[in-house]
Amino acid sequence: LLRTRYAEPAVRAAAETLIDRLGLGLAGLVNILNPDRIILGGLHRGLLAADPERLRAVVAERSLWGQSGSVPVLPCTLDHDSLVGAAELAWQPVLDDPLAALR
């Protein structure tokens, strides 16, 4: 839908809302984790491809790192969803209980 109908006002408005919210979430993660880069796959890669400047601007604008530069936001180069799923599965315990993962 993003690739074929992004020029339509309703599709574009919905995508921009999603991009802005994704950017806010990523900025929060940047502030907490201080990564050297962000790699987006799946649906998130599609949002990055739809409007990379907007997403990168939101992350830079809302993150502390944005004050001195910005963290690179890059598309995932893995085309196999199973590999991406395996990587997400490895992170699930951290997402479920972040404090326990630090112990």
Predicted features, each with a name:
Residues 1-103:
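ATP-binding/phosphotransfer module of carbohydrate and carboxylate kinases, centering on a glycine-rich
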